Design a protein with these regions (language model features):
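Conserved AAA+ ATPase "SRH/arginine-finger" region at the nucleotide-binding site
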Residues: 132-142
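Residues at the starts of beta-strands that form the adenosine-phosphate
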Residues: 30-33, 105, 132
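Conserved catalytic/switch belt of AAA+ P-loop NTPases
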Residues: 96-104
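Short Cys/His-rich metal-coordination motifs, predominantly Zn2+-binding knuckles/fingers
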Residues: 143-147, 183
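Structural recognition of the conserved hydrophobic beta-strand(s) that form the central parallel beta-sheet
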Residues: 81, 104-112
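Conserved ATPase-coupling elements of RecA-like P-loop NTPase cores
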Residues: 84-95, 113-120
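Conserved P-loop NTPase "ATPase switch" module shared by AAA+ and STAND
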Residues: 74-88
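Conserved P-loop
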Residues: 1-71, 114-125, 138, 159-166, ...
Length: 215
């Protein structure tokens, strides 16, 4: 039994990592139970784990996790994989049941922060419970030189949609872009990164006048 946590921004290869993990364990004869959230229908209406290159593996799509404990596929599994973990409100009790009670191996994959750099869902609550935590990075879409992207920036339209709904929206390259710290801060708060103008030098004659009046 073990718990591995894979976190990072969008376009960091998390779905590709899931596919690699699943195929590797299936090649060893393991029964693998893969879960994704039902609200993620970006690429297909079928329950699948899909990366941005459109490679797919079958999964169970659900709005919550605890009811899945009754499914025979779960009971027969040796490895449980949870994708889009940030969307599951019952993530922590489910994972504790899987690992601590049912003694299975579990891999949880999700965004650690939203487009505002706030903790996303219950993902970070799993850090103290994990055997291994891996922070993946994407490549900054602005640098163009392989600089690591730590954060996800929402486009103007997606940000407005999220604010109107009160929750982050599901989207892909049309809605979000991975950025390094510098370009994220530039896009979010350009004023903060604008150098302050040098202090205006007081003309010498003004200083002399001030000194005379002071006397």
């Amino acid at each position: 039994m073990s718990l591995e946590l894979l976190i990072g921004p969008m376009f960091a290869g998390k779905s590709s990592a899931i596919q690699s993990i699943v195929r590797r364990h299936q090649s060893l004869g393991w029964s693998v139970f893969v879960v994704t959230h039902s609200m993620d229908t970006r690429y297909t209406s079928e329950p699948m784990v899909v990366n941005h290159d459109m490679q797919m593996i079958p999964a169970v799509a659900a709005p919550s996790l605890m009811p899945l404990l009754e499914r025979p596929e779960y009971g027969a599994s040796r490895l449980v994989v949870v994708e889009e973990a940030q969307f599951f409100a019952d993530l922590v009790p489910f994972v504790m049941r899987v690992v601590d009670t049912d003694r299975k191996h579990c891999v949880v994959v999700g965004l650690d922060g939203d487009a505002e750099r706030r903790p996303f869902g219950r993902v970070l609550d799993l850090v103290p419970l994990s055997d291994k935590v891996t922070k993946l990075t994407a490549m900054c879409a602005r640098c163009g030189d392989g600089t690591a992207a730590l954060f996800t920036l929402a486009t103007a339209s997606e940000s407005a949609a999220a604010n109107g709904a009160g929750v982050p929206c599901v989207g892909g390259a049309e809605a979000y872009v991975p950025l390094c710290r510098h370009h994220y801060l530039t896009a979010r708060s350009p004023v903060l990164l604008t150098p302050s103008p040098p202090p205006t030098e007081v003309p010498r004659q003004v200083i002399d006048v001030l000194q005379i009046h002071a006397c």
